[in-house]
Design a protein with these regions (language model features):
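Switch/coupling loops of ABC transporter nucleotide-binding domains
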Residues: 1, 27, 76
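Conserved acidic segment of CheY-like receiver
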Residues: 1-11, 16
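Conserved sequence signature across two-component system core domains
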Residues: 6-7, 32, 51
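Short helical segment in ABC ATPase nucleotide-binding domains corresponding to the A-loop/adjacent helical element
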Residues: 17, 21
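CheY-like receiver
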Residues: 22, 39-135
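Conserved Asp/Asn-Gly motif in the active-site loop of CheY-like receiver
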Residues: 29-36
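Interdomain helical linkers/hinges and coiled-coil/dimerization scaffolds
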Residues: 106-182
C-alpha cells in the first residue's frame, strides 16, 4: 500500500514518516510539499491508496486537494490534519469524504489508531474489488455458456452484452445455433 503525505513543512512530513516507520505500517511513503504537487502526483501515479494532507499550504490547500481526489480518485482514502481546531474545517473535511480529521500537533496514539483503521479499510476495499472482479469473470463465463448452450433470443443476448458495456452499435454480429444429432 502507498500513502501520499502532503505538507509544506518538511519537519511535519519527516515526523509523520517517522511514526509510520515506528509502528511498522508497511506503507510505501510518497511526499509532496503542497497540494498542487500532490495533485500532479495523483494524476501521474495510480497506486496511491491513502492521502494524508495538511490543510494550509501554498498553491493549493489540502481541502482543494481532497476535493480533487474525491472527484478524480474516489478509491483513495483521505485523512486531513491541521492546526485549525474550528468545527468548520472538520465539516469541510467531511464534505470532501475525509475519513478523519487530526489536529496538530498530532497525538501519537491517535495517529496509530487512525492509521490502523485506514489500513484495515484499504485491505477491505482491495478484497472487495478482487471479489467483484472474480464475480464479473464468473458472470462473463456464464454468459458465454448461455450464448452457446441455450436457446435464448438474440434480444436477451444483446441485453446481457449491454450489461457488460459491450457496445454492439455499428458492428455486424451473427448468432448461429447449430444442433448436432448423435
Amino acid at each position: 500500500m502507498k500513502i501520499l503525505l502532503v505538507d509544506d513543512e518538511r519537519t511535519e512530513r519527516e515526523g509523520i514518516r517517522f511514526l509510520i516507520e515506528k509502528f511498522q505500517f508497511e506503507l510505501e511513503v510518497a511526499e509532496a510539499a503542497n497540494g498542487k504537487l500532490a495533485m500532479e502526483y495523483l494524476q501521474k501515479y495510480q497506486d496511491v491508496d491513502i492521502l494524508l494532507t495538511d490543510v494550509k499550504m501554498p498553491y493549493m490547500d489540502g481541502l482543494q486537494l481532497a476535493k480533487y481526489a474525491k472527484e478524480n480518485r474516489p478509491d483513495v482514502i483521505i485523512i486531513i490534519f491541521s492546526a485549525y481546531s474550528e468545527f468548520d474545517y472538520a465539516k469541510k473535511a467531511c464534505e470532501v469524504s475525509a475519513v478523519n480529521y487530526l489536529l496538530k500537533p498530532i497525538e501519537v496514539e491517535e495517529f496509530k489508531q487512525v492509521m490502523e483503521h485506514v489500513i484495515a479499510l484499504c485491505r477491505q476495499k482491495k478484497q472487495w474489488k478482487e471479489q467483484k472482479e472474480n464475480l464479473l469473470v464468473a458472470d462473463k463465463k456464464l454468459l458465454l455458456y448461455r450464448l452457446f448452450n441455450t436457446k435464448e433470443s438474440v434480444t436477451e443476448i444483446v441485453e446481457k452484452l449491454k450489461e457488460y458495456k459491450i457496445n454492439l452499435e455499428n458492428k455486424y454480429i451473427c448468432f448461429v445455433s447449430i444442433e448436432t444429432r448423435n
